[in-house]
A protein has these predicted regions:
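Core RecA-like ATPase module of SF1/SF2 helicases and allied nucleic-acid translocases
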Residues: 1-4, 16-122, 127-135, 157
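Short, conserved active-site loop motifs that form the nucleotide-linked donor/cofactor pocket
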Residues: 9-12, 85
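Short beta-alpha junction loops
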Residues: 138-142
Length: 157
């Protein structure tokens, strides 16, 4: 179901590890930037801190301007005119929207010892931050990743 959004069919792709997932997202973001989408219109939304650290390290090494919004206050008070990719948790992303959103590590969901229904709602929050393009990646197999692959294949057909 579309959740009332319009835009490109979401992308979901399997990669061998989290680092390669982030590298794929960087490739996608560079392509969107080359097509005229500003860095400030892109966000990477993650579930747990180690993912955010991997994202930040790789974006910095790639020379992409980036701002890590590590808390709820920061996610509400950032400079939206600063031309940088915004990186934040799924929780912090609530209420925000970006033309381009990437979510790495979908295969980690549902996160250990957390209610799968709550994790599904949290993933939904992250996914619906995307107004035009949604890129998701996974390397670990999970019920969430498989359901997303199936749903996107159905929509794209």
């Amino acid at each position: 179901e579309s959740a009332g959004r319009h835009g490109a069919v979401p992308l979901i792709t399997h990669r061998p590890n989290l680092g390669v997932e982030v590298d794929y997202i960087i490739e996608c973001f560079r392509q969107y930037h080359d097509e005229g989408i500003a860095w400030r219109e892109m966000a990477i939304i993650y579930r747990v801190k180690f993912m955010g650290e991997e994202v930040m390290n790789r974006l910095r090494r790639a020379g992409i301007p980036v701002e890590w919004l590590q808390g709820s206050w920061e996610s509400r008070h950032f400079d939206s005119s600063a031309d940088s990719v915004k990186v934040m948790t799924m929780h912090s992303s609530k209420g925000l929207e970006f033309p381009v959103v990437a979510i790495p590590g979908v295969g980690y969901l549902p996160w250990k010892d957390f209610d799968p229904a709550e994790e599904a709602r949290l993933l939904y929050v992250g996914m619906t931050r995307a107004m035009e393009h949604l890129v998701m990646t996974y390397h670990a197999e999970s019920s969430f990743a498989q359901k997303l692959v199936t749903a996107i294949e159905r929509v794209a057909a």
